[in-house]
Every structure is written in structure tokens, then in C-alpha cells.
Curated annotation (Swiss-Prot):
This is UPF0250 protein XCC3453. It comes from Xanthomonas campestris pv. campestris (strain ATCC 33913 / DSM 3586 / NCPPB 528 / LMG 568 / P 25). Belongs to the UPF0250 family.
Amino acid sequence: MEISSDNPDHGFQFPGTFELSAMGTAERGLETELPRLLAATGVELLEESISWKHSSSGKYVSVRIGFRADTREQFDSAHQALREHPEVKWTL
């Protein structure tokens, strides 16, 4: 997913399309729960860009979610929702 600006010093540009990844314990339904959690923050999910991959041991799952945020506050709220989930070990 490409995020571009006419001035790289600007940082994130809003409204914009973004992607967050979260890794957590497998078999907890994070593949469906995390997209619902993000949608509840008010961002627009990009359903076609939701994907996940299980670790080789099957103990963890990485969930990648694309979304559109109109403001920095929406982006921060979405990221915070993932970080606060008790089964999420890290976000990116």
C-alpha cells in the first residue's frame, strides 16, 4: 500500500489509506475480531485488503488490515484499539 506526499516532511496525510498489522495468539478468532474492532473505531475497512497468516508452529497469527482514516485521531484510535486487545502481542 503506497502512502505518498508532495513533501516527505509532512508525515502521514489525511484523509488517507493505511495498513496496520497485529500479531497475537492463534485460535482466538483474531482474523475476524480485529477487523470488527477497527470498524468500531469509525474507520472505513478495505475488505479486500484484510489478510492473515499463521506462524509455522501455528501458535500465532498475524492479521493485516487496510483501512481509510479521515483524521489522525481516527488512525490513532484504530491503532490503540489493536494495541489494547488482550490477545495482541504487537502491532505494526
